[in-house]
Amino acid sequence: MLLYSSNVRNEYKFVIIYRLVYMGEIYRMCDSDKGYFVWLLKYERERRSLSVNDICEGICSKGIYNKLENGGTSSSTHLIRTLFQRVGINADRCGIYLKLDEFRELSDRQNILEGLHSGDVCAAKKLLEIYEVQYGNNCFSAQFCTYMRARLAQLEGDDESAILLYNRALKATMPDYDNIKVVKCISVYEAFMMLNIAGLEYKRGHIAKAEEIYATLLDYCHSSNAESWNMACIYPKAVCGMLDIIASGRAHREEYSRMYQHALAALSVLKETSRLHYIRPLLRYMLVLAQDNDKCRLEEYEELLEGCEHFFKMQGHDYELFEWYPYYIDCGFCLVNDLINERRIMHGMTIEELAGTDCSARNLQRIIMKQVSPSCRTSRMLLDKLGLKGALRSDVIVADNIRAYKLWDEFGECFVLRDYEKAEDIYTQMCKNLNAALEINKMTMSFMRIKLDMVEGDIDLSKAAGLLKELLPFPIEAAGKYRILTKIEEIIILHYFYCLDKLHLYDEQPAFDKFMNKYTGDYLSNKLNASMYESAVMHYSNYLGNAGNYDMSDIYANEGIKVEIECERMHPLSTLLYCIAWNNEQRGKVSKMDLDFCRMAYIMARYKGNTNRMAFYAKWIKSHDKKQE
């Protein structure tokens, strides 16, 4: 339970009483993040009536899993992320701060993927050979190697070898795959292997086999109730794969009505997550399906498809990103050693002061020098000392039930749609669901309260900016000194500059410039940290434009658009498009391209159901259409 002092709405001071959380027959009182992610895992497993064997089969023994679920062991990030996805949870919920060996391995994976993504097969092969020697001694790394060899074979036109390798890779974690008729739980990674196999089986003329795989995955998507972040990666591709078979005349057209419901569900998942994965082939099929099932929506689908086709072509994006692999987009892992050292410097602590009596100064020195990885226990202990209690296993928040994470996602959407009453209700629920003894959660709830009071008129922009500034553990002008900030800290910084922008105060632009330096010129990093990058570049390009720096605003807006299209995302896309058009309006030279950009912004706003932005863009288009005439 969380109580506030009587003047909470003005001073935002917390009085904490550890809340009691009931789950099954277990009561917990906890002031650390230890165990939260495994409680979340257990809660979801039991809620979905999955057995231990269901989720650990092929990836670990029941004994290891039971120890993990009871908080008695620390396992590899590969295992934990796979387990999370198998119970339908977005894997980022278990944290992004990795040990040294895991960080290096995932960095090497990303380099291989970049080689394949860019079509540089020779470079990818060489990197894969090195990776296999260094890491190929566990089932997850060996599976990755086999999967990459399958993709290389496919790129070289050897479909026969590719399908054999895809099957071998899948059976590394799903050994009974050939006999599976119903999928109870599956990781995104495993689902993509099945989709790749289905696609190749269809290409080889094995229609019944391909249809069976697609049907299995469609049934899973329909009934699993997994998080939308996972479904956005799987559902659209599975729908398009099955419709390829039906459209070719290899299956019954009576399936169209049922497939239209699947297509609607897939489109809904993309809309909810602001993703564009497989949006074009999905919409092409929906235009056909709607002829018999939903003619009233034809115009909507036509407009969205035409806009996406035109805009993707304009950006040179002529392929489907998720064609073959759940690419490492928005999986920007951080090295926990770096986080610890940056925070030590931030607080002005010597190595000896931070080590204290809990670990040796010599060992801490080796951690800082990246000679060794700290254990999970040591990392948690050091971060607790540094004011980051809860950060090790955090996304934005740390919670033991998936509802809290969904509420946070919904909170942001409320402000887009201006549904402040719902946002207030979400805040109340979050206060009941989160343990504010964890600094990460305390900071998040303070931010939510400030944002609500600002839009409800209880505090003005100047007061809000001051309160946001006070939430940070460092001066705002020092924000650019640190490369690793928690997600909630970045969110607070961006909202601080948003307040200054609304107040037309630009004296602190140098601090904003320094903060944005980490996003400058590192295209791969921006893709890997897409969710934070897209928010940062949206606020910064708007800020620069409003400050009269139109050229720099255009540069950042265009870079943001490039990353959004490359990653097939659309959360700030309409704002970035309008930013460029608005800059040119201020210059007095609105072009046809600006009108195209604003029309695309309108289409995206309509797709998301944002009627306020639709009306705003429509008015701008109407005004400048007349001038173009």
Protein language model features and the residues they cover:
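"A position-specific structural signal for the A-helix of alpha-solenoid helical repeats
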Residues: 110, 144-151, 189, 195-196, ...
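DNA major-groove recognition helix of helix-turn-helix/homeodomain DNA-binding modules
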Residues: 76-93, 375-393, 627
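A short, Lys/Arg-rich alpha-helix, primarily the initiator
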Residues: 8, 14-47, 318-347
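Short C-terminal boundary/hinge segments that cap the last helix of small helical domains
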Residues: 88-104, 387-404
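Flexible helix-coil transition and linker loops at the boundaries of alpha-helical arrays
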Residues: 96-97, 131-142, 172-187, 220-233, ...
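Residue register of alpha-helical TPR repeats
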Residues: 106, 144, 185, 192, ...
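Helix-turn-helix repeat elements of alpha-solenoid scaffolds
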Residues: 115-130, 156-177, 204-223, 251-265, ...
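Short alpha-helical DNA-recognition segment
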Residues: 48-67, 346-365
